[in-house]
Amino acid sequence: MNKFIYETMYILRPDMTEEKVEQAITKYKSMLEEQGAYDIKIQHRGKLRLAYEINNQREGIYIQMNYQGPPTQIAILERAMRLSEEVIRYLTVKQELPKTPETDTQKNLEPAVALAE
């Protein structure tokens, strides 16, 4: 099974207090941990101006999470964000882990051994 690196960027309402923002970050981080995610890195980007108005908001609090884990965790996380009134936008992208040079070298050697026989 391939392992993937995921990045989820979500935008919280700008009128949330710092305490509520921290609660939201903790909630989504613990949700990922419960689903088997690991190597979770969170970056609090702060309050930034939106490119366009979303739900009558011109600013938002940007949070970025980078993590690894099973693909099933994404649907659960995004469903929770979709139902939450504190999240105004979210996006998750995935990237396949790069293959180690060791495995590429082994693949190249196998056909040569087969041809030599």
Swiss-Prot record:
One of its GO terms (biological process) is translation. The keyword Calcium does not apply. InterPro entries: Ribosomal_bS6 (IPR000529), Ribosomal_bS6_sf (IPR035980), Ribosomal_S6_plastid/chlpt (IPR020814), Transl_elong_EF1B/ribsomal_bS6 (IPR014717). Keywords: Ribonucleoprotein, Ribosomal protein, RNA-binding, rRNA-binding. CDD domains: bS6_chloro_cyano (cd15487). The keyword Acyltransferase does not apply. Pfam families: Ribosomal_S6. GO terms for molecular function: small ribosomal subunit rRNA binding; structural constituent of ribosome. GO terms for cellular component: cytoplasm; ribonucleoprotein complex; ribosome. Belongs to the bacterial ribosomal protein bS6 family. Binds together with bS18 to 16S ribosomal RNA. This is Small ribosomal subunit protein bS6.
